[in-house]
């Protein structure tokens, strides 16, 4: 049994269905194994965003993602997407309903949503996403995120948005320390983030790593994705082992199951082989994920007991 906290809906679209809808094999458009940069990697989202406008498509892709999670033995997932990317034909209400309808067809996996603000959006559009998150909080949506081109839109410039997020008591996570330096992670910490997407470049600063440890801030680490975007050139250079050994709270995630052509089972296998992580480590990563999830304390307890029963 596994828990996944960092997973993008539009980066995890079923290839067979996408190919069927396009009338051709679209594997090359959806998989970005040799992207070489985050901005290049993000180009693989163009087709999914086009396909995720129709409500039937949205429901079907969501259902197939839930089936994929079930096959990967995931019992809880937080799936993120930007609501404003999918409203060419429909309202946000209809889009969210279609996603939840698709997810609910697979009763073995509990899935909550995280809305993403985008770095390249205007402040007005991101404020709209904050308003939408407020409206849907507790109705399938559990938090807000900031995603997109980190290198060209620096984290520190979004301070006002996160002041608004905090003012509205919205739980949040922030993509940081992926395509930009440890300063980006420091900015996320300054905003009060308890969870950081990727965050691997924190390793550039002992002080930042120390702050993560003392404040109990968790990193949503996505190893294969980091290889694809060339955050690290080889898995052996990934800082995950150093971070775990130092005492940083780490969770393991896929980021984008289709774009990175991966599953949690694959991620675990890679980490097992490269860093000799064992079953106890993976249990701990999953317990970290439960503790750092945006679930209620009661839901966390239930999930923890499920995991412990299964791993024992």
Language model features: what each stretch is:
Residues 1-170, 179-184, 190, 194-195, ...:
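Metal-cofactor-binding active-site regions of metalloenzymes
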Residues 172-174:
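Conserved hydrophobic beta-strand within the GNAT/NAT acetyltransferase core sheet
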